[in-house]
From Swiss-Prot:
Domain RRM: 477-551
Example of a GO cellular component annotation carried by this entry: nucleoplasm
Compartment annotation: Nucleus; Nucleus matrix
Residue location of crosslink Glycyl lysine isopeptide (Lys-Gly) (interchain with G-Cter in SUMO1): 18
Biased composition (Low complexity): 1249-1262
Descriptive protein name: SR-related and CTD-associated factor 8
Comp. bias regions, Polar residues: 327-354
Organism the protein comes from: Mus musculus
Keyword Acetylation: no
Purpose: Anti-terminator protein required to prevent early mRNA termination during transcription. Together with SCAF4, acts by suppressing the use of early, alternative poly(A) sites, thereby preventing the accumulation of non-functional truncated proteins. Mechanistically, associates with the phosphorylated C-terminal heptapeptide repeat domain (CTD) of the largest RNA polymerase II subunit (POLR2A), and subsequently binds nascent RNA upstream of early polyadenylation sites to prevent premature mRNA transcript cleavage and polyadenylation.
Listed Pfam families: CID, RRM_1
GO biological process: negative regulation of termination of RNA polymerase II transcription, poly(A)-coupled; positive regulation of DNA-templated transcription, elongation
Modified residues (Phosphoserine): 273, 617
PANTHER family xref list: RNA PROCESSING PROTEIN LD23810P, SR-RELATED CTD ASSOCIATED FACTOR 8
Length: 1268
């Protein structure tokens, strides 16, 4: 019974899904049912109960469950052994009575399943036939009082006798207008005769159905006319004539069977129906004379006419209003039918005409309506196909039939016309003129219909979904991509999708293995969906899934209207808020055909919010010019690169006072009349690509975001003199390079001072700038933005075409949003490529990572953008322009230089390939550029190494500053995040847990450390201290390169890493590391030879972390250790006290041991001997845990914190009493470490072990024994 419980839970979980149910879910339910086949009776009962109790919209999924289970069982066990089908057929009538309580639209799906069952012999014909009759409205064999719904008389059991239909009952059931017509008893008798036939009963039910539908409010034609009803009506009208004609020739049984067969064919919407119609219509007419003319004419035609004229007329009227073809109504078409020249008897002719004309018209109207229905039912067929894997071919056939029907409608109708024409050959005299007239009218309707069809095809090509009346279609252009490999990159997705069209954005969610790809055009995303869903496309190793995704612009309240299959949100007009319209287009587009015209008038009538005017009001002319360009206004472009920006500054505070109409570009803050609604907000054809000058017609400008996008730049900004008087509050919109503050020698003669921009008047409100700045600048700091000195407002901007080469230095001030990735005003050089950043003034509230050169107000903290100066020709790949300032502790890499106060009258630099001519030579030498008293940092070149000769400022005494030697940098220019080989950054030297243990700096260190190696000269006598080191890697001949050195070696000529790159905290461990001079001896350097200009410094060049304590400039040495400081007093190999006190790293097995091992042959051989002999092993438990492999550890000593640094005797750096006084063992405290060291058989594993592994186990901080 466990299997039954599983099946029940699967089945009832259908209620958690919104129909239509997915194929995967159906498969799960079917599998559960097949697993529970031993309890098949329980399974069948569960499904029947589910269908009985579920909500109407879940009835059809319940039928699909039956279908799927029966098909799977027949497929798996064979038709004879299948137990499910017979069991379901036991109770199938009541099951289908419950099924027919589904919504009206779903009935056609039930009929379709029944037809498929019949074709595939899933159930016997005698079982399916009554079910089809039920669909047509024929009750199962018992007639009980009619219910007020389409599912009348469904609760009967088969086998009970039929109660006769009396004329009185019929009269009661008929609507009032008919009762008056059926007054006399002859008529009543005739009616009774007709209505007692099965067709009569069907007709009765149809009448009631139509009545009910008339009473219901009819929101749209599609809901009013459900497919089943129209088909039934068409079938019955034709059938009743034929039945009345053949009443004497056919037995009732034959009649029923033939009728049902034909009816069933109708439901199939196939071409077969035409053949049945053909045969039916060509039945010999003489037979009609056997039937009483009174019945034929007076009663039946009155009923038929009533039906068609009352119901179909109003329905078709509705339909025609929608489609607006000029179509002829039934009355028109019947006007000409009663001519004097009818060759048949008048009654016969009129009856026949009555039938032929309405039927032809009915056929037209049904076809028009079918066109609409096919659009919806196409999806139903697909859905059905999902649930019937067995009958795929059949389903495909039926689908192609429905679609071919919708495609080839006009030829089919011509066929039906020609058929009726062939019948009229007998009556050619009377019908010639009429048929001509009809053809004219018909051709008119065909042409309009063809137009509608072509329009629909066009829409499908564009990927647009079908239009629904009084409904706004918001079409998504966003695709959901599922099962994306977690290793996949954004580039992989871009490569896959860009062949279909322009991509607006890609949002990846690696943990969920999916991504959202937003395309610019609906057509592109539609094609991508079609193609990628059909094949098995892989990204990485996984086959992706793809589907429509709800676009961002549709808010939560509208999500209920989302249709995932069509990728469209159908929002009823009455639910749409006009304010939300603009937002809908984000990640999608609005189908213009579905927009309510009233909304546009509502939007147009809303007053345009005028910009807040400053003291100077704009000229009226300007206003008009903006209005005239309204027609050309396009919506502002969405930033194509999707760069996150800070919240946009309100437009109110950005408006400059006025700008002359002749200006080619509107000023930065100007906010014109908003664009007309419903235009797609993505690609703006009126704007040039990024990097070009804007067109002369001012396109619309959105308020620029507070932060520009990050673009690497390599332009030079001249130092500006900013006097405190010039520093005033200004609006963001006009913060530009103030020409008055550029030194006269820097501005070329072609650009007179004053023509850069038109500053705002002083009447601008003063709250603006603090309002902008307060987000980013810490509150305790003095923020003084820069203002340009007053410039005559008549000045015009220089505009120059993008390709022109210019020697004038400053080209023009660029509008903030010329394109989506240049949002900052600035100066453009002549030959800057599109991706270059804009250089120039920047508002003070820029974030750290913006990477744009900016003017830094004197007292603003380093947290906001600072002015960085970059040499002319060097590209800067890091995206941050600026040098890491010596004492800025954040790792963010701020732009760390500031302009000096006075103007620098330096000679212009004359480099041929210079990007920006006529800018001053920025020769960076200490003391060359006067330092302002305010700035804390020297003005250094960022991005490339500064001169190699200069050690970091303030690291050496002032007396030791040498003259500059060459063009290479002093120190480590690369901020901590950019470590080579991804080694984690070391904390800096201030972080020693116990500040008392910190070693004094400078010369004091020499006195304190008694165990220095006196082979080195004292620090005062050093020479060549700043000579650039030689980048030259040599190794001991004959010693195999240790595999651990592989990843650590620097590139041979990379001057950015002068020594080996750091390997997490592996610098000075327990044992002192190899002395550099000793190492040189090994390499064949004679000791008397001075350190050469290209000698390779083997030492680490990053300072070791010391925890805690504030940092001074001297201690922030990690940044500047790249230089060759051979005699560095602190982290040199001989400073045993320093090394011992700082480090607690027991598990480090890299550099220090290599250096120690290589230091000299005697020491190397001695270590090997110790590791290899019995004596060494005997002492394991006292002193250290040696690995068996000499390469991994030569030896291992106790914690540095437990040794005294100063009184350990030393011979040549060797600790001779190493074995005599064993330090306390750390390893018993840390069993994990003990195992790790002891199991050094895993040497090879550990050599290649990751840095992360070492980190996680290595550091053991024994703070409790620190004082001993």
């Amino acid at each position: 019974m466990e299997a039954v419980k599983t099946f029940n839970s699967e089945l009832y979980s259908l209620n958690d899904y919104k129909p239509p149910i997915s194929k995967a879910k159906m498969t799960q339910i079917t599998k559960a049912a097949i697993k529970a086949i031993k309890f098949y009776k329980h399974v069948v009962q569960s499904v029947e109960k589910f269908i009985q109790k579920c909500k109407p919209e879940y009835k059809v999924p319940g039928l699909y469950v039956i279908d799927s289970i029966v098909r799977q069982s027949r497929h798996q066990f064979g038709q004879e052994k299948d137990v499910f089908a017979p069991r379901f057929s036991n109770n199938i009538i009541s099951t289908f009575q419950n099924l027919y309580r589904c919504p009206g639209d779903d009935k056609s799906k039930i009929v379709r399943v029944l037809n498929l069952w019949q074709k595939n012999n899933v159930f016997k014909s005698e079982i399916i036939q009554p079910l089809l009759d039920m669909a047509a409205g024929i009750p199962p064999p018992v007639v009980t009082p009619v219910l007020a719904s389409t599912t009348a008389a469904m609760s009967n059991t088969p086998g009970t006798p039929v109660t006769p239909v009396t004329p009185a009952n019929v009269v009661q059931g008929l609507p009032d207008p008919w009762v008056s017509q059926i007054a006399n008893t002859d008529t009543l008798a005739a009616v009774a005769q007709i209505l007692q036939s099965p067709q009569g009963q069907q007709l009765q039910q149809l009448i009631q159905t139509l009545q009910i539908q008339q009473q219901k409010p009819q929101p749209s034609i599609l809901q009013a006319l459900d497919a089943g009803l129209v088909v039934q009506l068409q079938a019955l009208t034709a059938q009743l004539t034929a039945a009345a004609a053949a009443a004497n020739t056919l037995t009732p049984l034959d009649q029923g069977v033939s009728f049902n067969k034909k009816l069933m064919d109708r439901f199939d919407f196939g071409e077969d129906s035409e053949h049945s119609e053909e045969s039916k219509k060509e039945m010999p007419t003489p037979q009609l004379s056997h039937v009483s003319e009174s019945v034929n004419n007076s009663i039946f035609h009155q009923i038929a006419e009533q039906l068609q004229q009352q119901n179909l007329e109003q329905l078709r009227q509705q339909l025609l209003e929608q489609q607006q073809p000029q179509k002829v109504t039934p009355q028109d078409s019947q006007e000409g039918t009663f001519g004097s020249e009818h060759s048949a008897s008048p009654s016969q002719g009129s009856s026949q005409q009555h039938f032929l004309e309405p039927e032809a018209n009915l056929d037209d109207s049904i076809d028009i309506q079918q066109q609409d229905m096919d659009i919806d039912e196409g999806q139903d067929v697909v859905e059905e196909e999902i649930f019937e894997p067995e009958a795929k071919k059949v389903a495909v056939r039926s689908r192609s039939r429905t679609h071919s029907r919708s495609r080839s409608r006009s030829p089919r109708k011509r066929r039906s016309r020609s058929r009726s024409g062939s019948r009229k050959r007998k009556h050619r005299k009377r019908s010639r003129s009429h048929s001509r007239e009809k053809k004219r009218k018909a051709s008119r309707s065909y042409s309009s219909e063809r137009r509608a069809r072509e329009r629909e095809k066009e829409r499908q090509k564009k990927g647009l979904p079908p239009v629904r009346s009084k409904t706004l279609s918001v079409c998504s252009t966003t695709l959901w991509v599922g099962q994306v490999d977690k290793k996949a990159t954004q580039q992989d997705l871009t490569n896959l999708f860009e062949e279909f069209g322009q991509i607006e954005s890609i949002n990846m969610i690696p943990p969920r293995g999916c991504a959202y790809v937003c395309m610019v055009h609906r057509q592109d995303s539609f094609r991508a969906l079609q193609k990628l869903s059909s094949g098995s496309y892989k990204i990485g190793s996984k086959v992706i899934k793809i589907a429509w995704a709800l676009n961002k612009g549709v808010k939560t309240e509208y999500k209920q209207f989302w249709d995932v299959d069509l990728g469209v949100t159908y929002i009823p007009w009455e639910k749409v808020k006009v304010d939300d319209l603009d937002g809908f287009a984000e990640g999608g587009m609005i189908d213009q055909e579905t927009v309510n015209a009233e909304w546009e008038t509502v939007k147009a009538s809303e007053p345009v919010k005028e910009p807040v005017q400053t003291a100077q009001s704009p000229a009226p002319v300007e206003k008009e010019s903006v209005v005239t360009t309204q027609a050309e206004v396009f919506p502002p472009p969405v930033a194509m690169l999707q760069i996150p920006v800070a919240p946009a500054v309100p437009a109110v505070s950005l408006v400059p006072p006025a700008f002359p109409v002749s200006m080619p570009v509107p000023p930065p803050g100007f906010n014109p009349i908003p664009p007309p609604p419903f235009l797609r907000a993505s690609f703006n054809p009126s704007q040039p690509p990024p990097g070009f000058m804007p067109p002369p017609v001012p396109p619309p400008v959105v308020p620029p975001p507070a932060i520009p996008p990050v673009v690497p730049t390599s332009l030079v900004q001249p130092p500006l003199s900013m006097t405190p008087e010039a520093v005033k509050d200004v609006g963001f919109g006009s913060l530009v390079l103030p020409s008055g503050s550029v030194a006269g020698s820097l501005a070329p003669s072609t650009l007179p001072a004053g023509n850069v921009f038109n500053p705002p008047s002083k009447a601008e409100p003063e709250e603006k700038v603090p309002h902008l700045i307060e987000h980013q600048i810490p509150s305790g700091e003095n923020t003084r933005p820069v203002i340009p000195s007053d410039i005559p407002s008549s000045a015009a901007m220089l505009a120059q075409p993008p390709g022109a080469s210019s020697t004038s230095g400053i080209l023009c001030v660029q509008r903030p949003n010329v394109s989506s990735n240049s949002e900052i005003l600035g100066v453009r050089p002549a030959n800057v490529s599109n991706s270059a950043a804009i250089m120039g003034a920047q508002p003070p509230n820029i974030l750290n990572n913006s990477g744009i050169l900016a003017i830094q107000p004197p007292n603003v903290s380093s947290g906001s953008g600072l002015l960085g100066v970059l040499p002319p020709n060097l590209p800067n790949n890091s995206g941050l322009v600026g040098l890491q300032p010596p004492n800025v502790t954040s790792p963010a890499g701020l732009l760390g230089t500031q302009p000096p106060i006075g103007p620098q009258n330096l000679p212009p630099l004359a480099i041929p390939a210079q990007r920006m001519p006529a800018l001053p030579m920025l020769d960076i030498r200490p003391g060359l550029i006067a330092q302002a008293p305010g700035p804390r940092f020297p003005l250094l070149q960022p991005g490339i190494p500064p001169q190699r000769g200069i050690p970091p400022p303030s690291v050496l005494d002032a007396a030791l500053h040498p003259p500059p030697r060459g063009p290479f940098p002093p120190g480590d220019l690369f901020s901590q995040p950019e470590r080579p080989f991804l080694a984690p950054g070391r904390p800096s030297i201030d972080n020693v847990p116990n500040p008392d243990k910190r070693i004094p700096l400078g010369n004091d260190n020499i006195q304190q450390e008694g165990d220095r190696d006196y082979r080195f000269p004292p620090i005062e006598t050093r020479e060549g201290i700043t000579r650039p080191p030689q980048v030259d890697v040599r190794d001991v001949v004959g010693r195999r390169l240790d595999p651990r050195e592989g990843p650590g070696r620097p590139p041979l000529d990379a001057r950015d890493h002068f020594g080996r790159p750091p390997v997490d905290m592996r610098e000075n461990l327990v044992r002192p590391s190899l002395d550099h001079l000793g190492r040189r001896d090994h390499f064949g350097f004679p000791p008397e030879k001075p350190w050469g200009p290209r000698d390779f410094d083997e030492r680490e060049h990053r300072v070791l972390p010391v925890f805690g304590g504030p940092k001074g400039l001297h201690e922030e040495r990690g940044r500047f250790r790249a230089g060759n400081y051979r005699f560095d007093p602190r982290s040199g190999p001989w400073n045993r006290g320093f090394g011992q006190e700082v480090h607690r790293d027991f598990d480090d097995r890299r550099r220090p041991w290599e250096r120690q091992r290589d230091r000299d042959d005697r020491d190397f051989d001695f270590c090997r001997e110790i590791n290899g002999n019995r004596l060494g092993r005997d002492r394991i438990q006292n002193t250290w845990v040696p690995p068996p492999h000499a390469r991994v550890f030569d030896y291992f000593e106790g914690a540095t914190s437990q040794r005294k640094g100063d009184n350990v005797p030393q011979v040549n750096g060797e600790n001779t009493e190493r074995h005599a006084q064993p330090p306390p063992l750390p390893v018993q405290k840390d069993p994990e470490l003990y195992e790790k060291l002891a199991s050094s058989g895993d040497v090879d594993k550990e050599e290649s072990g990751t840095v992360a592994g070492v980190e996680s186990e290595a550091v053991v901080e024994s703070t409790e024994t620190e004082g001993t």
